[in-house]
Amino acid sequence: MTMKKLLIIILPVLLSGCSAFNQLVERMQTDTLEYQCDEKPLTVKLNNPRQEVSFVYDNQLLHLKQGISASGARYTDGIYVFWSKGDEATVYKRDRIVLNNCQLQNPQR
């Protein structure tokens, strides 16, 4: 078998392995943060490689990308904003607070 044919056979296998490895690494770099807000608990998935957070609010799964913030970490999709600083967070919908006084539960120090 020529080297070219061997490469054609092996290359897709190697590339699929890289994709699976990258997905595994990305899952390992995702943190689950548990907050207790005024009204209810909030579970937030923080995906550092993608610079986004995701959570369920009002029966919708939201994915918010990291935005510009003078202080703390701010994530938005244009409608919702998740803003955290230290162990506290707030969720806004169209500039109105919908989840307030969210306290991180069991923070890792």
From Swiss-Prot:
Gene Ontology MF terms: lysozyme inhibitor activity
Domain of life, source organism: Bacteria
Keyword annotations of the record: Cell outer membrane, Disulfide bond, Lipoprotein, Membrane, Palmitate, Signal
Signal peptide start and end residues: 1-17
Lipid sites, type S-diacylglycerol cysteine: C18
GO terms for cellular component: cell outer membrane
Major place of residence: membrane
Disulfide bond annotation, renumbered to this chain: C37-C102
Pfam families the record matches: MliC
Compartmental location: Cell outer membrane
Lipid tethering residues (N-palmitoyl cysteine): C18
Mode of membrane association: Lipid-anchor
Family recorded in the similarity comment: Belongs to the MliC family. Type 1 subfamily.
Subunit structure: Monomer.
Entries under NCBIfam families matching the protein: PRK11372.1 (NF008475)
Its biological purpose: Specifically inhibits C-type lysozymes.
Name of this chain's protein: Membrane-bound lysozyme inhibitor of C-type lysozyme
Source organism (scientific name): Escherichia coli (strain K12)
